[in-house]
Amino acid sequence: MRRTAVYRDPLFLAHQTGRDHLESSERLRTLDRELDRPEVAGQFVFPDFASATIAAVQANHSREHIREVAATAAHTAFYLDADTRTSNASYGAALRAAGAVIDGIERLDRDEIDNGFCLVRPPGHHAERDQAMGFCLFNNVAIGARWARKRLGYERVMIVDWD
């Protein structure tokens, strides 16, 4: 039987984007309800994982950008750009999301799992080195790819994005 890890955390639900925002916690709440069903939950592994370190995030993002995102923790609502709204939980959730990706890559490398799915918020594949973009605070995909290359010695990493 395949070992599929599903990464989820209540902190991802605490990232608030506003009632009418396209990127909503309801997406994960719906999936959580399904995953909590006994006949479904038994098919997956739900690993414990740590948040990404600042050093891991800094491998892909500038110090200034990280400070800008961290500063949003002082606000109940703050816009980093026209599409990217944060709340006081967003910075912590973003570090946790990047940590989920790193942990999944580490477990895949150690052959502890066959595949993984990161049910994270805020999403993380549009952010650039120096700015949030497209609902994303940090680029979890780039952070994970760099981790695989620099820490685990992978020469190439393929990224497929179909949104």
Enumerate the language-model features and the residues they cover.
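HDAC/HDAC-like amidohydrolase catalytic core signature
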Residues: 1-162
